[in-house]
Amino acid sequence: GISTLKKEQLVEKLMKSEKYEEKREEKKEENIEVKREENRKENKRANKEEKRKEHRKEHTEESKKENREEEKAEEKAGDTEEKKSEAEGKKNDISSLDSGNMANGILEVMPDGYGFIRCENYLPGENDVYVSPSQIRRFNLKTGDILVGNIRIKTQNEKYSALLYVQSVNGYKPFDAAKRKNFEDLTPIFPNERINLETENAPLSMRMVDLLSPIGKGQRGMIVSQPKTGKTTLLKQIARSITATRPNMKVIVLLIDERPEEVTDIRESIEGPNAEVIYSTFDELPEHHKRVSEMVLERAKRLVEHKQDVVILLDSITRLARAYNLLVPPSGRTLSGGLDPAALYMPKKFFGSARNMREGGSLTILATALVETGSKMDDVVFEEFKGTGNMELVLDRKLAEKRIFPAINIQRSGTRREDLLLTKEEQEIVYALHRELSGNRADENMEQILNFFKRTKNNKEFIQLMKQSLLKK
């Protein structure tokens, strides 16, 4: 009986324990589901909060951007007002510094970077105006530029007046002048446009040169002459003709080692807004000759950079070479006549600068060279320059002694590539003339041709007359 009771009790206990465990498991599952739901709810809350935070951030960023833009706009407005006030202040400062006087002259840049505006004959003087290195760098200014600007009020300690601001460079706006090409970077080509020297009532010499030895834009011509053959008169006539036929062309007559009365005569005879006479008389130092010639060359280069046509009439390249021969340090080598080879470098650079530019603009140089002066040096200088030009006009002393003017030796005168300058009709007549006159003496040739020129009013009539006379033969 006891054993059965115990068994029943054990079975009940086992049943209770199984139920208990089942309940426990059910409770565990319920707890797990509750936790899952709580986690889901928390995740949803977290997501909602994150979205709210993001929305708040976006809203705050947009508001910040708007605030920043407003601040920037305010700053810009403030800056513009400040700049305007500063500009007005600067203008007031500049206007207070402005002396009211204008500077107008050629710039010479020194090796140290600063420069001076030279006013008279391209040389230093009391009225020169100082130009600061910052102005030279800003506008790409070079030696030879013509500057126009306002002068600052001069203080007691200052030796020279100073340039306050630049108004124009070579007649152009300063920033336009800064963009120009360098002279050395331009492309040289043969002269292909003729400079007509024939005018109404023109002297016979100009008509003869125009036909027998034509001059083109960019010509590098040499007038070879013995003393007292009329070279200075010929240069004067050429300058007059160019100013008459080409009023827009810049003509610079450079007189080196010349007589003072000749300078006055040429200055009074050549008129025109684009004509200049620059001189250094024989009583000046060689340094003076050198400086004047270099300034004239730089002036011409600056004009060519602006695509302008320039003519330099130099009298004479022989005297310029003599001046450099006195200034050049001895190289230890000497040519016949006591000429140092190094002395020819700068005169050759001057003469070689003549060229016609493909990009536009031209520099024409006509230089006189002296021969048979009794000085061996002069003959050596001429021989050195003989092959460098592309046009030669030879004057003959025998003709001048017979008082046959112009004393041009037709057989020895001529232009290279004259086919680019003459018409076919003119070219045929010139060639026929040379053939006809080849066996005669220079004075006989000149007398015959002068008779033909005197019988006609212009070169067109001369060509027709020559055609008729040559056809008869």
Locate each region found by the language model:
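Phosphate-interacting basic helix/loop segments used at nucleotide- and nucleic-acid interfaces
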Residues: 95-103, 204-208, 296-301, 350
